UniProtKB/Swiss-Prot annotation:
Presence of keyword Nucleotide-binding: yes
HAMAP family for this protein: GatB
UniProt entry keywords in alphabetical sequence: ATP-binding, Ligase, Nucleotide-binding, Protein biosynthesis
NCBIfam families assigned: gatB, PRK05477.1-1, PRK05477.1-2, PRK05477.1-4
Domain of life: Bacteria
UniProt-recorded name of the protein: Aspartyl/glutamyl-tRNA(Asn/Gln) amidotransferase subunit B
Xref: SMART domains: GatB_Yqey
Substrates-to-products reaction catalysed: L-glutamyl-tRNA(Gln) + L-glutamine + ATP + H2O = L-glutaminyl-tRNA(Gln) + L-glutamate + ADP + phosphate + H(+); L-aspartyl-tRNA(Asn) + L-glutamine + ATP + H2O = L-asparaginyl-tRNA(Asn) + L-glutamate + ADP + phosphate + 2 H(+)
Oligomer and partners: Heterotrimer of A, B and C subunits.
GO BP of this protein: glutaminyl-tRNAGln biosynthesis via transamidation; translation
Example of a GO MF term: glutaminyl-tRNA synthase (glutamine-hydrolyzing) activity
Family: Belongs to the GatB/GatE family. GatB subfamily.
Encoding gene, per UniProt annotation: gatB
Organism: Lactobacillus helveticus (strain DPC 4571)
Amino acid sequence: MNFKSTIGLEVHFELKTKSKIFSPSPVTYGAEQNTETNVIDWAMPGTLPMVNKNVYRLGIMVAIATHAHILPTTHFDRKNYFYPDNPKAYQITQFFQPLARDGYIEVEVRGKKKRIGIHEMHIEEDAGKNTHGTNGFSYVDLNRQGVPLLEVVSEPDMEDPEEAYAYLEKLRKIVQFTGASDVKMEEGSMRVDTNISIRPVGQKELGTKVEMKNLNSFDHVRRSLAYEEKRQEQVLLAGGHIQLSTRRFDEATGKTVLERVKEGASDYRYFPEPDIAPDHISQEWIDQIAKELPKSPFDRYDDYVNKFGLKPYDANVLLQTKESSDFFDAAVAAGADPTLAANWMNTQVNGYLNDHRVSLNDIKLTPEHLAEMIKLIKDGTISSKIAKKVFAETIANGTDPKKYVEDNGMVQLSDTSVLAPMVKKVVDDNPQSVEDFKNGKDRAIGFLVGQIMKQTRGKANPKMVNKLLNQELQNR
């Protein structure tokens, strides 16, 4: 018997705001426990939520980028449940009228394109964090309480783990390039819940779904879904039935483990939030946000390959992060040759970031620095070898490349009136190399170039030296 899978994903994005959704408390990853909270986060009696309007703006950006229909009126609702990290005993979310509905993302898997629907996206507040100590006590950190989240709920349109993986990759890149979230799974600013059911091929009725929550990497999503497909198949083939349940993925074993069985859908007794009035989202505001929306990664890719002539691989490396793409764009805007800029970004810059475990925001090299250094290489002022020394100084200390070259006498020697006599003398002093060259040994000229570079302390223009050497040797 063959089975067909049905997969849906719920993805939470932490929105990139300076303060929380309903309170003025700041949002800083890694802050000391309970240092970024106030009486609203604690749910003290008499306190009222104040909506951070920037949350709407960021959510609308994602809705536009995913072709979703933005509702003209949206409001918040209460989702009632009790848990220690939820001091109000309810979560403020959007249930009846979310921010947007009916979007989609197109993915390509195994050479075939497919449209994955987005059922809705809604805004809500995050909960705090529980930590269970070894002393029998549990500790609650409310720094995360009230951090704004955008939940993107897909339609159950995915039919295998690879489609789910492709959808997540595409969605993550879209959200990142809008600037709405930094989508760092390791910091919890992107979290994934999955739902999967299977049914015999030809059966219209969906099977019983199993949920897996808070998967912290795309690889875990793919592996957990693949395992769950096989597990459910084995249960059904053995004559059993699938339980409506929540499971977790065990990274060590690669298996899913039962957490709890559900008797039915949870009843959170949603009702409209009485302390927050409904908000009207005008078409004028939507149009304004659409105009301000950064260029998508897909449009950038077209520019990089078709306009700048970059190789697809180099374009994709630049588009790994919005910061990298923005840096490259700024360097080209400052006059850098696109091909050279991409090469330096993908090799030297990325190498430095990986070696020092820092981001582009942490270094002192600017796009203007990179553009200036590339100009110095192109016009022959410095060699590629010298450029690496200039790069090391600039990225570490922010030194102006041109000034550093001039102050340290690094200007490349290209004057033929100076180089020609040196070339003649080196050829005169090395008759064996001349003989080797005439006998077709290409390494001979490399030796002669090395002698001149040694005499000039690496300042001689290699192209010019090669040209003069070939001319001199041809005349011997």
